[in-house]
Amino acid sequence: MIDTAGQKPLQDSCERQKHSLEESRNALGEDHPDTLTAMLDLADCLWAQGRLIAARKLEEAVVEGRRRLLGERHPDTLKAIGKLAVSLAAQGNLEQARQLQEQIVRGRRALLGDADLETLRAVNNLAGTVAAQGDFTRARELLASVLATTCCEFGERHPDSLTTMSNLAAVLWQEGDRAEAYALQQQVVEMRRRGSGENDEATRAAVAVIEMMERDPGY
């Protein structure tokens, strides 16, 4: 029997978001910034329910509206494009997602420069999609560049540095460079332990990756 009790808070939240969106549409109009924000909030809720097609339609509407109102490179437009790219990738539309993420990277670089964390995170996201397409060489190049910049600007123990290091280890593992991948992931575990402790969620996740690597017959 399906347990629906745990789903009820999420269903209630989505209903509230729908009501808020309708109120905003009626009071302010379809293209008002508050309406577009309410639309994106509802898309997030639908995404959490697994209703990816409905979420994607709302995200597409928000992207179009923000492009008209704010322009292609406004931070709010880029945020909406980023959410749409995630939905596209989750539905298997990797090439479309990659094109949008490349657009985000260009926009972030133009607004913030190459070394800003938002730019570096955008490149990190792009690398994930590139890797999902099987282009591990390009993904590795992107992640190595992000890691070098993040370590230089913010230090190797910065959370973004450690996340990038772990992502790079995953790509190296997929490429078949198991020894280097394991060594890099081990560094992540050690720095997570020193920085956040053994019981931190990020530390436990890093340890779980190491354990997965050790169980792999190919290691």
Regions found by a protein language model. Give the residues of each.
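Intrinsic-disorder-linked linear interaction elements in eukaryotic regulatory proteins
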Residues: 1-219
